């Protein structure tokens, strides 16, 4: 079944907030094998001008799992069959580093749904903001729904 094109342009309101902790950042840095001291040592981060440890840029992917319940892909009316979905790509535009102590929330928008051969490509844009409204990052994620494009008459 094709993905519901009526979702293109649909906005999803701010999610519940998530407080970023030092341990969240440290665990992620260890998991990806990045030894940057600014990710684990507050003194090293402060020496670089940050208020606390900072997160690796790709840390924001973990927030997608926390914010996911408010996302378009959780909406049954979208018609997305998770058993057919693979991750396409992820892009990050960081407006400032994510720091321990940040309280973040996100809004999402379905930017595009289109056929690519027998598959469908869905692009979602997420705006991540701090509690004070400061824009932290803009992410763009694409997912591929395999074999669900509308069949074309030959």
Predicted regions and their residues:
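HotDog/MaoC-like acyl-thioester-processing domains
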Residues: 1-6, 94-154
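Hot-dog-fold acyl-thioester-processing enzymes
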Residues: 1-87, 150-154
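Short alpha-helix capping/helix-loop boundary micro-motifs
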Residues: 89-93
């Amino acid at each position: 079944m094709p993905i519901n094109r009526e979702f293109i342009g649909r906005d999803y309101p701010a999610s519940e907030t998530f407080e970023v902790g030092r341990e969240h950042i440290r665990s992620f840095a260890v998991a990806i094998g990045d030894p940057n001291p600014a990710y684990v040592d507050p003194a090293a981060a402060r020496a670089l001008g940050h208020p606390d440890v900072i997160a690796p840029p790709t840390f924001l992917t973990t927030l997608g799992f926390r914010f996911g319940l408010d996302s378009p892909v959780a909406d049954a009316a979208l018609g997305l069959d998770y058993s057919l979905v693979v991750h396409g790509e992820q892009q990050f535009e960081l407006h400032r580093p994510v720091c321990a102590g940040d309280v973040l929330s996100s809004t999402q928008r379905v930017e595009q749904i289109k056929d690519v051969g027998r598959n469908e490509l869905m692009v979602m844009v997420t705006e991540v903001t701090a509690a004070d409204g400061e824009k932290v990052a803009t992410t763009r994620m694409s997912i591929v729904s395999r074999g669900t494009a509308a069949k074309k008459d030959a």
